[in-house]
């Protein structure tokens, strides 16, 4: 009665075997015992009876039945064999009453190897079942590689989510998924949340693979994360399959990007171009049409030194390109719905948009996908998206010099440092400052506080309560603030005395980017790269600078200038030489320097910093929304905090 099913399954097996042989691949099931030593199997741990994804069942525990199945688990033996008769009997049982008894499997690196129940797996795979009940035993791999670290992250994720059917190819994504579905790190999932996520995952998987996702070297989980970053988790539930298909088509480059070993192409300096003629210097390619450029700020210049700096940059652009570019500022975008502010800017016929705060990254990305004719850039760092570009400055170069100034003035006293947010770029600034202080003062200690925890005044008070008078505070002063404490200051009974300050030349940054857009080199960069483009320019490009007070001793001013020239020429590298973390781990020894990618991805603090990365729950609302967008990777952040706590 069920012979026809067996014949069809056998044909699938024969086809798979031929395909594997033609490609030089092993055509049968993998055998766990062939690559896992017996002593490791003996030390395996019981997981219990769980539902496992059938697609992740890839082989057998022992070699007894290996050649009875092709690599796709379809049967190869003749239909007259006892094996075939048992297969067809199970086929009937499945169709009439269902196969309920759990199989027995060994799990290794999220793949399952059957100890008992191979034919049940074969039958259920033939009929397209998604999961199967299994009594599982887990064999843990040795740690040390990126692959195993991702695996251990999946185990941590499974503890509180009970989700075991999604996998990723990059570290940190399980905790990123936890955030994207609206859960706090470590927060347990309810049964309803698991059902809803399972439904969303398999709906997305069906559409994504039908669209061609199987051709990409990308896990379904990677693709789903990329989708959710643009459209959100809730929208995945509400959209029909046809709507999901349309959305996937719009962001296909976000999926192909996931195939890259390194997702981001850091542009460390502006493109070197031939000097244009007088007319083209202002407006390349002889364009006569006036361009409209929008600057969308999360706050207002009167309330935020950061926004005030970007507003000065906009005014610089307006002056330099007068008559050729018109700029418009949109303030307080985060006071309401920032997506509506972006839409209004587009309705106002702006074709180039700068969103000047990291927490507007998500809405900027969504707008860029929906409006491919509009050029959108977001002021943030280390974000992997093809449809927008990010820009930030290597402020750590200036902070290294300021740290050296502080170290030279501190003597035997500690120095204070107040940081805004634990985000990409700012961790490097903390460490560069501390290393600069240590370079001139080997015993220098830097006490770290956060303005995103109870505000700037509270952070300053915590330092002064320790008797610390030399403090590096916010980079930019709020023009309406009563106190103009910024940069490196000496706190006296009569008030702060400013000694040195970092300067962001946003006008130079915006002018250079706009020239690249107008002369088409901006588009050429996109076409020549398959990665996400992040601009990360430094002192040499003129986008950041150091101003020193005349109150500084002459020798200290000369030291600062010497270091500035060294950094601009590439001779002086802030992260060169032996580096050691707070927990004692040596990052590298003498004669080496961190790569730009390592600098950007810092989630650890050097050994002369006293303090920690703040806990998420301690942050202000603005701090949380900023960290949600561009915070250091949660997995490594949480791990580094735990390591530091355990070492104290």
Which residue stretches match the model-derived regions?
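A short, basic-hydrophobic beta/loop patch
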Residues: 97-113, 119-150
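Short beta-strand segments enriched in small/hydrophobic residues
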Residues: 282-306, 414-420
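Extracytoplasmic "Venus flytrap"
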Residues: 292-312, 317, 329-333, 425-427
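An alpha-beta-alpha
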Residues: 314, 401-441, 532-551
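Flexible loop/hinge segments that line or gate small-molecule binding clefts
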Residues: 369-392
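Hydrophobic alpha-helical segments within soluble ligand-binding/sensing domains
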Residues: 392-413, 503-524
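Segments of small-molecule ligand-sensing domains
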Residues: 520-525, 529-645
């Amino acid at each position: 009665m069920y012979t026809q099913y067996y014949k069809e399954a056998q044909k699938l097996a024969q086809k798979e075997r031929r395909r594997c042989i033609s490609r030089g691949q092993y055509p049968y099931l993998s055998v766990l015992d062939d690559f896992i030593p017996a002593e490791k199997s003996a030390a395996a741990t019981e997981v219990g009876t769980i539902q496992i994804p059938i697609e992740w069942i890839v082989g057998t525990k022992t070699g007894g039945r290996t050649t009875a199945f092709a690599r796709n688990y379809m049967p190869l033996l003749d239909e007259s064999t006892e094996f075939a008769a048992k297969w067809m009997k199970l086929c009937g049982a499945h169709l009439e009453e269902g196969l309920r008894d759990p199989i027995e499997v060994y799990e290794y690196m999220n793949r399952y190897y059957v100890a008992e129940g191979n034919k049940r797996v074969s039958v259920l795979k033939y009929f397209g079942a998604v999961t199967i009940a299994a009594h599982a035993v887990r064999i843990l791999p040795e740690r040390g590689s990126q692959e195993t670290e991702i695996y251990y992250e999946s185990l941590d994720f499974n503890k509180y989510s009970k989700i075991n059917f999604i996998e990723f190819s990059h570290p940190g994504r399980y905790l990123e998924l936890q955030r994207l579905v609206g859960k706090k790190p470590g927060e347990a999932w309810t049964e309803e949340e698991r059902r809803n996520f399972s439904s969303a995952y398999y709906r997305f998987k069906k559409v994504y693979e039908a669209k061609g996702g199987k051709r990409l070297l990308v896990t379904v989980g990677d693709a789903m994360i990329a989708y959710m970053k643009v459209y959100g988790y809730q929208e995945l539930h509400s959209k029909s399959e046809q709507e999901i298909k349309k959305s996937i088509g719009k962001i296909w480059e976000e999926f192909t990007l996931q195939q890259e070993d390194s997702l981001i192409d850091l542009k460390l300096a502006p493109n070197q171009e031939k000097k244009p003629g007088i007319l083209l210097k202002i407006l390349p390619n002889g364009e006569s049409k006036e361009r409209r450029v929008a600057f969308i700020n999360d706050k207002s210049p009167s309330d935020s030194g950061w926004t005030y700096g970007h507003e000065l940059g906009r005014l610089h652009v307006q002056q330099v390109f007068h008559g050729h570019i018109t700029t418009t500022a949109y303030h307080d975008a985060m006071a309401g719905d920032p997506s509506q502010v972006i839409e209004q800017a587009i309705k106002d016929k702006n074709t180039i948009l700068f969103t000047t705060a990291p927490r507007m990254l998500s809405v900027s990305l969504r707008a860029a996908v929906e409006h491919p004719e509009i050029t959108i850039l977001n002021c943030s760092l280390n974000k992997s998206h093809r449809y927008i570009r990010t820009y930030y400055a290597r402020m750590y170069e200036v902070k290294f010099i300021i740290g050296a100034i502080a170290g030279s003035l501190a003597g035997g006293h500690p120095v204070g440092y107040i940081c805004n947010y634990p985000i990409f770029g700012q961790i490097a600034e903390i460490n560069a400052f501390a290393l600069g202080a240590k370079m001139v003062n080997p015993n220098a200690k830097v006490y770290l506080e956060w303005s995103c925890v109870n505000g700037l005044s509270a952070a300053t008070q915590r330092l002064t309560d320790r008797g610390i008078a030399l403090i590096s505070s916010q980079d930019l002063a709020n023009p309406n603030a009563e106190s103009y404490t910024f940069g490196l200051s000496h706190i006296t009974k009569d008030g702060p005395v400013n000694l040195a300050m970092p300067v962001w030349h946003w006008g130079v940054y915006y002018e250079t980017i706009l020239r690249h857009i107008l002369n088409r080199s901006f588009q050429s960069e996109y076409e020549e790269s398959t990665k996400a483009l992040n601009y990360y320019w430094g002192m040499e490009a003129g986008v950041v600078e150091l101003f020193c007070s005349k109150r500084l001793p002459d020798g200290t001013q000369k030291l600062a200038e010497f270091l500035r020239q060294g950094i601009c020429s590439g001779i002086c590298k802030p992260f060169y030489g032996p580096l050691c973390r707070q927990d004692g781990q040596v990052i590298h020894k003498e004669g080496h320097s961190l790569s730009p990618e390592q600098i950007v991805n810092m989630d650890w603090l050097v050994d002369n910093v006293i303090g920690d990365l703040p806990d998420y729950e301690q942050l202000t609302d603005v701090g949380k929304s900023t960290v949600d967008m561009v915070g250091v990777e949660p997995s490594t952040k949480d791990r580094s905090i735990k390591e530091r706590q355990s070492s104290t």
